Amino acid sequence: MFMKRILYIIIIIIFSVNTFAQNKSMTDTVYSIQEVEILGASKKKVEIGKLNVPLQYLPMSVSTVSYKDLEIRGISNIEDAVKFLPGVRMNTSYGAFQTLYVRGMTYTPIMIDGVRDERTMINSYPFSDLTNVESMELLKGPASVLYGHSVLGGVLNIVRKSPTPQTVVNMKMSYGSWNNKQANMDFGGNLAGPLNYRVNFNYGDQDGWRATGNKRLSGYLALGADIDATSRIDVRGSFHRDWYGTETGLPPVMMADVYNTDGTLYLKAGQEIPGLNEKKRYNNESDFLKNNGWDISGKYEKKFSKSMKLTNYLSYKYDDINYLGTEELSYLYNMNSVYKHYIDKGTYKMYINLDSVQLTYPLRFSHIAKTLGNQLELSGDFYTGNIKHNFLGGYSFSQMFRNSYTGYNNAPENDKFNSEYDIYGPGIYSVIAVNNPLSMGYMKSKFSKAIITKDYTHGIYFQDLIEFHEKFKFLLAARYDIYKYLRTGANTYGGIRKYHKSEQTPYSIATNSAFTYRAGMVFIPISELSIYTSAASYFRPSRTFPAANTIYLNKNGSDIDIESGKGIFHPETGYQFEAGTRYTYKSILQASASVFYIRKNDIVRSFGRLSVGSDANGNPVMKSIIGQVGSEESKGFDIEVAITPTHFSSFNLGYSYTDTKTLDIQPNKYVNIDTQNITLVPHNTFYAYGNIVVPKGVFSGLSYNLSISFMDKVYTNYAKSMSFSSYWLTDMGISYPLKNGIRLSGNVNNVFDKTYSNQAVYGTQRVPGMPRNFMLSLAYSLR
């Protein structure tokens, strides 16, 4: 096995990719301190309050992957794209809800064109396709503090395609395994005078490996113009209409040792029922997830001189999630020996039926989020004596109004057809066979409660990159954030997403504010090498109010009295350090390495839904457990290397080691917390990808691409009753240009047909990863 892995890596080194024109050289590239895009890599430039200095002047770690590298591999989903960023893991749950982990830290914010998506700070959310994206850029470590509260470990910036004066015509149609169909159109050019544009449309439809039947539709328009020699305006808008079949996974692993009736051990705790068909789907026929949304933004730039610029960025985003999902699969229990297996409870035996599962906890909710944001920034440079200062000062404002509608009042099992309840019908509490699951009928649903929340954030910030000497640069930055969170509730009417404002309860209000800092230094002994270090503080406001069927724990492990009327949790605080180096040799070699340490205090963690007792029939009573469990630290290092041995080949690899632990944990009566590992965080991640293009001859333009990724073992719950085993995945593709701008390509993913999993429901219901699959594409480009 080890020799196979070495062989894979050697193959990539031999067959490595990207034409010379596509390679991103860092030697003389100008970077923005709040942008990650390498300007020399494209015809356009995304600026986010930029400081025009070379990358080697900046004490920060940057990782980049271009959409071109993703497109030739047939990747348009964010969870597949981030595997080419070191120390990153995207956790997907219920089929489409996604949470980004960077350097062991969860709820990493995601930005679109430099503007934070405030939704990603509080919940997992679906993300639409990446076909309108130019590049993805990860800013890691203390540099991420530039983007406001709750940023720790890193921040991911998704840079969309910009208006272009050059004519662009790209069309692509693809067909793949499980009836996967995709079509994409990308146009750009000059409309009239100084006005340029970019348009993108994408459609996707598939049966899916596990018959989820996901569908996607998206559109994007960007307009840009130079008003005069000193002013520019850029307007962008997009929409998406996505439908997902949701995912409840396979029957849960055993929460305790299971015995045969003769007393012999059948399954150990954490083991799965043997012989499960990984393609079988256990969801109800009524399950669905709809995600519709649109956004619009405008950016205005005014240059007062070569050394000073004013930028204002106004944005609005609307997002609508509508969800009904079979989440919990439960085994049937009985105190009498009516089943073939049992769990030893010490003083008695609890018999368990492993031949079927019951759909016990369907969930119905909807979130409508409306986010308004604005950034006003002044940047430039000035001198104090012979010392140059590159400064940026700004004010940011964001408001997110989110209405959440819930239908959690499920019909009881003995009255499951009663339409007075939120979820009812023959499908609820239905029992289906483990080996041949078939839907036992529909579920109907409605909403009964509305939760109305309002988030307001004001931030003032300033940073100064001081060129003290040609070999020494210093960076100082400070930020002050004021955060206000309001929450109220009301009953809906008619079972739909409507409520009467006159029936709202009084607002619960949480207000937090904090000062955060950042400091860094860069040493440049030679022009090809820079060494840097930086540090920053961290703040995450508290926004937790009491919820039904939830138990809250304080940092001492005791239950919190939520009737006291006081706030439940304290804000999280913390700090992070980083030291790194960057080396560039001509256009042949680019290498970087960094070590980091992160600590945050008063962390809040969800331990999932756990059994807190039994009802009169012996069935477990389930409640959500949330606790402010103590502190958490993460430490490790990242390495990235890019090699361009010829004009027609290149090689990229990255490795990250992350050790994340909880600290200062007090015991509680509900769950044992192991301080050695945090859930869903791998110790080791690795990627390598490359391509070779035939430069001339009969097969001129023929290209090959190959990529390898490794994900280490991760635990899915704090009890460590289930984990995802480590796995390697290998993908490859080939592409050949035909006449008149037409290109034919094919991709094979999971070449060696590895069995793996990377998501689970409740940490116990494993969702199998896709086996070997194929994609064929026909593309046209106007040259």
Regions found by a protein language model. Give the residues of each.
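Short acidic/polar hinge/loop motifs at secondary-structure boundaries
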Residues: M90, T99, V115-K140, V159-R160
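Structural signature of Gram-negative outer-membrane beta-barrels, strongest in the C-terminal barrel
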Residues: D226-D228, A369, K388-L392, S396-M400, ...
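Outer-membrane beta-barrel translocator/receptor signature
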Residues: R119, T131-V133, V145-G219, I227-R232, ...
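Conserved C-terminal beta-signal and adjacent last beta-strands/turns
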Residues: L363, H367, S379, F391, ...
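N-terminal periplasmic "start-of-domain" segments of outer-membrane beta-barrel proteins
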Residues: E37-D69
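Gram-negative outer-membrane beta-barrel transporters
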Residues: E470, Y597-R599, N617-N717, F752
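Membrane-embedded beta-barrel scaffold of Gram-negative outer-membrane proteins
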Residues: K303, K309-S315, D319-G325, Y532, ...
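Acidic/polar loop-and-plug regions of large Gram-negative outer-membrane beta-barrel proteins
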Residues: G224-D226, T230-K303, Y318-A369, F417-S448, ...
